[in-house]
């Protein structure tokens, strides 16, 4: 009997040629499709197509399968050390993972930057705005709502988080570039006359989580918690080293 599932999974983005299938020799989607030996790539649907170089702790993909969730996770996790599936939820057939309640991205900033100065500028993005000046142009409606911005300090530096129902292409990275350029200044980011073309590096950006209020995801394996922690440490080490060496 075929069941439909959402799987939460993470990946180290800089180890791939991009996210979307067909994007170079080794994309994240192509890696999953190849691992599961799927005859039809359309059997996989994804919640977020992250920019090249962006990592994730909890993206979501949808699949219909006769296999057990444990088997799906085991196959993917055993075939690539840079992708890990860590939890699942059974859903109705045909459900689109893109329609979520909240997506949260976090951006890691090594060094002595203070949260207070970042938040002064970042707070200008809160609320419902036209983000066409802070995204790469496509056919989608550019109006988006930033529901929450948070900042906290870690041992390596600070982490800035953005939560919204959806984001546009390059939106978070352009917002970050603006915040870093004008940090400490309380200005209206939407008062800029032209498209803001600066963009923050992708390697520091991580898709932290995707929330569906009606779903409760079940962890697949205690060992995967350890694997997730190892991936977090690997990302932090890479980001810190990259910022030190340039």
Curated annotation (Swiss-Prot):
The EC designation for this entry is 5.4.99.12
Name the chemical reaction catalysed here: uridine(38/39/40) in tRNA = pseudouridine(38/39/40) in tRNA
Question: Which one GO biological process term can you cite for this protein?
Answer: tRNA pseudouridine synthesis
What are the entry keywords? Answer: Isomerase, tRNA processing
Q: Which residues bind substrate?
A: 105
What is this protein identified as? tRNA pseudouridine synthase A
Tell me the protein family, please.
Answer: Belongs to the tRNA pseudouridine synthase TruA family.
Where does the chain cross the membrane? none
